[in-house]
């Protein structure tokens, strides 16, 4: 008798073309589930003028309507007639298993409620490592209260909890949650070969590219990088490439004007990876409650030397000075780290080789997604 193809539903606050670490995590995880023979249904929010029902490489996508309030930072689902129709379609997909990304997004409550109503097993994948901060003590205080209240509602459904890093596992204990294990954020094993030799920008043989790729928000530490680069006064063959969009972009472009600093704006995945393939030093100076940053894994597999802060699971990847530099969260530390790698080519190349090898051996979806078999 032929085995029934199992269908997995993934509930996530955002999905592509919204470009962030969790969205790339969802994309790569579900792509590998499809390769392993699963049907995949993604239930997300409609953060723009996108089709409410879509298909992408074997994955069915349902985009729920949202209210217009802060929809680009925290989507609030609008439970109108369109919502009811879409959720009826999801019910008709004959789901076998539910995966919810993050405790903090309201789509997780939707997914867990759906699983309960349909008597389905469910898991929550946590991507955090501390309370979210907007650098305002008053707002952060109430934000932490909100997170505890929301987490209590999530726990009420009794899902199994997993995390994308060991540090995320430890953070869940803050909410009296014992995670079942770690499902590491990962990258495709073929990423290195897919983008080897590609280029997004013109680059001479003696040019050095220092790159940041991510959202342009204060919490990501982007201004630390701009300050550190500007104070270094490097020779004309050293360039800082800033890829990404966000509320701080216009202000930073105005403040940091230099022939050696390029603000590239929002790039698609292929453009970003082609830039990574040209990158000598990738910097991720985040002060954000990360899980395990996707861009560190991508840059590392594409053989960039990495400088990053000790946030989330970063130190589980860069767990030795032979693999990269873990900086302090200040301009001076980043300035010194940049100087070291710009001036020491041998060290830079050694770190590039070592981190690429480590990620290929331990942080690829081909290995990670096996933990989702059920």
Language model: regions and residue ranges:
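Short alpha-helical donor nucleotide-sugar binding micro-motif in glycosyltransferases
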Residues: 266-267, 274-279
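Short hydrophobic beta-strand element within catalytic cores of glycosyltransferases
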Residues: 296, 305-308
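Acidic donor-binding loop of glycosyltransferase active sites
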Residues: 277-291, 304
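A short, active-site helix/loop in glycosyltransferases that binds the activated sugar's phosphate group
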Residues: 148-181, 187-191, 251
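Nucleotide-activated donor-binding/catalytic signature segment of Leloir-type glycosyltransferases, i.e.
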Residues: 250-270
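Conserved donor-binding/catalytic core segment of Leloir-type glycosyltransferases
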Residues: 162, 187, 202-220, 226-230, ...
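Nucleotide-sugar donor phosphate/pyrophosphate-binding loop at the beta->alpha transition
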Residues: 121, 130-153
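Conserved acidic donor-binding segment of nucleotide-sugar-dependent glycosyltransferases
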Residues: 320-332, 340-346
